[in-house]
From Swiss-Prot:
InterPro entries: Asn/Gln-tRNA_amidoTrfase_suB/E, Asn/Gln-tRNA_Trfase_suB/E_cat, Asn/Gln_amidotransferase, Asn/Gln_tRNA_amidoTrase-B-like, GatB, GatB_C_1, GatB_Yqey_C_2, Gln-tRNA_amidoTrfase_suB_CS. Allows the formation of correctly charged Asn-tRNA(Asn) or Gln-tRNA(Gln) through the transamidation of misacylated Asp-tRNA(Asn) or Glu-tRNA(Gln) in organisms which lack either or both of asparaginyl-tRNA or glutaminyl-tRNA synthetases. The reaction takes place in the presence of glutamine and ATP through an activated phospho-Asp-tRNA(Asn) or phospho-Glu-tRNA(Gln). Disulfide bonds: none annotated. GO terms for biological process: glutaminyl-tRNAGln biosynthesis via transamidation; translation. Its EC number is 6.3.5.-. It comes from Chlamydia felis (strain Fe/C-56). This is Aspartyl/glutamyl-tRNA(Asn/Gln) amidotransferase subunit B. The lineage of its organism: Bacteria, Pseudomonadati, Chlamydiota, Chlamydiia, Chlamydiales. It is an enzyme of class 6 (ligase). One of its GO terms (molecular function) is glutaminyl-tRNA synthase (glutamine-hydrolyzing) activity.
Length: 487
């Protein structure tokens, strides 16, 4: 990257739209379910029929409160709804019901690790609103599916507290993990359950000025978010450098863009609307939402352990490496799998490696998640215990892991009973004979070892393990080999 670019920094804030996993929609009894036939989960309310009146979904309110508790936000005892007016085919009422002036949540923060450092990303607010329908294009015409119209959302608005793409991705990743842990959304980004609108501007480093921002709409991939932020950063910096004498306010107009992953560039959709353009006014068909501290406290008591707290506990209780702990807590189901396995295996570091590396790699190849593969936590724990006790070698353990993937209902113990030929070598005289043969076949390695080249020892061990098909106990191989070499 040009040194000139290094003199600039991004200023980034995110608006995250999260579909709540309620049974019904926000203001009607229509089902909230993804993937059904178009226009089957609809009602007069979500299709904007004359005379239909909204009724607020209590479950959606509870989930918004739970989110507030998870991020240490302030829950408003009094909040209200407003109409946001705009015309678009996927909005049959020509307005959205949202919370413009009095949101249910203010403040709070999300904790994340960025480049090895703990960061607190501050939130401005979170508010409840309903989703729009979906336009579906078919060649020369388009149809509208209103199944999504009226689905409850919380829109989580961060402060402009991120200054590079790494910050934004770390925040977004931590936020999605937190949402998944507290169970208020299925967090399926491919299905649009979580969508990111990214606001970004740039400024010279050291400046406190907030210049005109650009919004990049509807991102549902962390990788695309990082690419879009970097591309937009470069575009804006170049525009300012090409127009040094212009008022910065006129160089980058406020606008809405989308990310084109094929062209690797942001594409203009429209110039930015002002708040007045939406003609906000109080929703007349809904009363003020009133809550009590006791009601909020009851919901707060249902909070599970949050991902960052779990991460810290894994470092403290299990003495795991930071990167391994981060991988484990990134998926609550994998974290639960690991914790169940720790009840039967106390070699936590080895166990975490088998969960996050060995089995995770095998599962990825097959498009599976270990937590739903059918393999039991007790099976992985038993495998690690067998290695520690010398019942099997690491090489045999990997072969057993392959067989567990094929037959997830079988434990390592069962697999060994069915395949006794997999058991390690127990005939030490045979092992000594093989070691002697390897030494005789590799005289140069023996000379190298005796002249201080330690890599030669590793080569000889590798040859022995190869000859024994990985069945020789590694500790005994080393012990016997050293004795034979010293003769």
């Amino acid at each position: 990257m040009s040194d000139v670019y290094a003199d600039w920094e991004s200023v980034i804030g995110l608006e995250v739209h999260v579909e709540l996993n309620t049974k019904s929609k926000l203001f009607s009894s229509a089902q909230n379910r993804f993937g059904d036939e178009p226009n089957t989960n609809i009602s007069p309310v979500c299709t904007g029929m004359p005379g239909s009146l909204p009724v607020l979904n209590k479950e959606a309110v509870n989930k918004a409160i739970l989110f507030a508790c998870a991020v240490q936000g302030e829950v408003a005892l009094l909040s209200r709804f407003d109409r946001k007016s705009y015309f678009y085919p996927d909005s049959p009422r020509n307005f959205q019901i949202t919370q413009f002036e009095h949101p249910i949540v203010r403040g709070g923060y999300v904790k994340a690790i960025v480049r090895g450092e703990e960061r607190y990303f501050e939130l401005a607010q979170a508010h409840i609103e309903d989703d729009a329908g979906m336009l579906k294009h078919f060649g020369e015409f388009a149809g509208v599916d209103y199944n999504r119209a009226g689905v409850p959302l919380i829109e989580i608005v961060s402060k402009p507290c991120m200054f590079c793409a790494d910050d934004a991705v770390a925040y977004a990743t931590a936020l999605v993990s937190l949402l998944d842990y507290i169970g208020i959304s299925d967090c399926n980004m491919e299905e649009g359950s979580v969508r990111f609108d990214v606001n970004v501007s740039v400024r010279p480093k050291g400046s406190e000025e907030l210049r005109n921002k650009v919004e990049i709409k509807n991102m549902n991939s962390f990788a695309f978010m990082a690419q879009a932020l970097e591309a937009e950063r470069c575009r804006q910096i170049e525009a300012y450098l090409e127009n040094p004498n212009k008022d910065p306010k006129t160089v980058i107009p406020g606008a809405t863009y989308r990310w084109d992953p094929e062209k690797k560039k942001t594409v203009l959709m429209r110039l930015k609307e002002r708040a007045e353009d939406y003609k906000y006014f109080i929703e007349p068909d809904l009363p003020v939402l009133q809550l009590t501290e006791a009601y909020i406290d009851d919901i707060r008591k249902t909070l599970p352990e949050l991902p960052y707290d779990k991460y810290q506990r894994y470092l403290r209780e299990y003495a795991l490496a930071e990167d391994i702990a981060a991988i484990l807590i990134s998926d609550k189901h994998i974290a639960n799998f690991f914790e169940l396995a720790t009840k039967e295996c106390k070699n936590y570091r080895a166990l975490s490696n088998w969960v996050t590396v060995e089995f995770a790699g095998r599962c990825k190849t097959q498009g599976k998640n270990l937590a739903f593969s059918g393999i039991l936590p007790s099976g992985v724990a038993q495998l690690v215990n067998f290695i520690d006790k010398g019942v099997i070698t690491g090489k045999i353990a990997k072969d057993i892991a392959d067989m567990m993937m094929e037959s997830p209902d079988k434990s390592p113990e069962v697999i060994l009973k069915e395949n006794p030929e997999m058991l390690p070598m127990t005939d030490e005289s045979a092992l000594v004979a093989i070691i002697s043969e390897v030494i005789s076949a590799n005289p140069q390695s023996v000379v190298d070892y005796k002249s201080g080249k330690t890599k030669a020892l590793g080569f000889l061990v590798g040859q022995i393990m190869k000859r024994t098909q990985g069945k020789a106990p590694p500790n005994r191989v080393n012990e016997i080999l050293l004795v034979e070499l010293d003769k």
